[in-house]
């Protein structure tokens, strides 16, 4: 299909049904601004909070946080469309309204699913794209699902001999942590939706009396909750990138510092600190010894491979007195103007347009189907 013209046509898909809808929009705005127009013909597709797909004008300025207001895709943002799950119509974006319904609005070569959270980063849209035979940026169905679910991420990491923090999983119907588990976890603990991100629904619990409210807050976003032991250590991150030839590389290390910054003493990198109030210091590169940085890069690639990831990921660590501990794997990390993933690659000598081009080229080279 790419022979149709000299530029690869990329559908940037954003928004979605998860509580991370707004952050997906912001990430998409940054990507739309930085995809090389000499190489890529870009189509912007928004997904509303209730799941409707619309062809939008893709203006980055409409996808920014402005005066604390979060962006959102609405049905009025553009023309309603669908992507048929039919390899015979590969890459066609078909009009649903207005008439004539069924008109092909655009045909794309590859999809860049800039979707964070459930119904996007969890293998669901990846499965649709596999059915439709359309190449896509990022992890496949298995790695997306495993990376989204903190319980199964940890299971796979442990199976590969990688260090993870202690935790307890609360499935639907279970509303508390036993006395033995409390003794084992200690305080503080962090209570999180098991399948969520951007610190939405996350609470720091420093007294067990606070636990029921924290579980309730997490369950507003996911019926499955994970309670993680607080880990004393520095918060470090590393980007992983796969190239079209299958080579996998790890970026310069970054560090997030919250405790003591602008009066914050709890060290909690929450949603507001990430996106609204400039309440964290982001150090890229992190001030760590070379041997520590090398070890974290090795562990990041091992974690990437442990969940059978493809394309890209950001791996989050705690650096403790006993060494690094893997916290999470993000198979579609944030791409906002302050996001660590593009900043770490920029510090590694890979600028933003080059980074995005590598991701798209890798997706096209990989294709779809069993591999």
Curated annotation (Swiss-Prot):
> For this protein, what is the EC number?
6.3.2.4
The GO cellular component terms are: cytosol
Chain segments annotated as coiled-coil in the UniProt record: none
Q: Which parts of the sequence bind ATP?
A: 182-237
Pfam families to which the protein is assigned, alphabetical? Dala_Dala_lig_C (PF07478), Dala_Dala_lig_N (PF01820)
State the free-text cofactor note: Binds 2 magnesium or manganese ions per subunit.
Give the protein's cofactors.
Mg(2+); Mn(2+)
| Gene Ontology MF, one | metal ion binding
Q: List residues binding Mg(2+) 1.
A: 316, 328
Q: Does the keyword Electron transport apply?
A: no
* Main location, first listed in the record: cytoplasm
InterPro entries, per the entry: ATP-grasp (IPR011761), ATP_grasp_subdomain_1 (IPR013815), D-Ala_lig_Van_CS (IPR000291), D_ala_D_ala (IPR005905), Dala_Dala_lig_C (IPR011095), Dala_Dala_lig_N (IPR011127), PreATP-grasp_dom_sf (IPR016185)
Q: Which residues form the ATP-grasp domain?
A: 154-361
Q: Which PROSITE patterns does the entry link to?
A: ATP_GRASP (PS50975), DALA_DALA_LIGASE_1 (PS00843), DALA_DALA_LIGASE_2 (PS00844)
What keywords are assigned to this protein?
ATP-binding, Cell shape, Cell wall biogenesis/degradation, Cytoplasm, Ligase, Magnesium, Manganese, Metal-binding, Nucleotide-binding, Peptidoglycan synthesis
- UniProt function note: Cell wall formation.
The UniProt similarity line reads: Belongs to the D-alanine--D-alanine ligase family.
User: What is the protein's given name?
Assistant: D-alanine--D-alanine ligase
